[in-house]
Amino acid sequence: MTHTETPPEESIELDPFLKLAQIVDSGGQAKHLIQAGYVRVNGEVETRRGRKLHHGDVVLVDDDVEIQVVIEPDE
């Protein structure tokens, strides 16, 4: 399953992004997924909850859910 998610800022940390994308319900769940190595950013396992995501980044969770980060420019 692939979808896009638009964070409200120019960048967003991985932990709150997973909550925004409704992959997890809490920061604790996000922490577990990230630290257990179930999250990839642009094809690389990411274990830092604070990893900054930017426009075009692709987040893959548990080799099942793929989300592309889309940042819309301010007008």
What are these regions (language model features)?
Residues 4-10:
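Short, contiguous acidic and Ser/Thr-rich linear segments
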Residues 10-12, 63:
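Exposed, low-complexity/repetitive linear segments and helix-based recognition motifs
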Residues 12-55:
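A basic, amphipathic helix-loop patch mediating RNA/tRNA/ribosome contacts
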Residues 2-4, 55-75:
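A positively charged, amphipathic N-terminal helix/segment that binds anionic biomolecules
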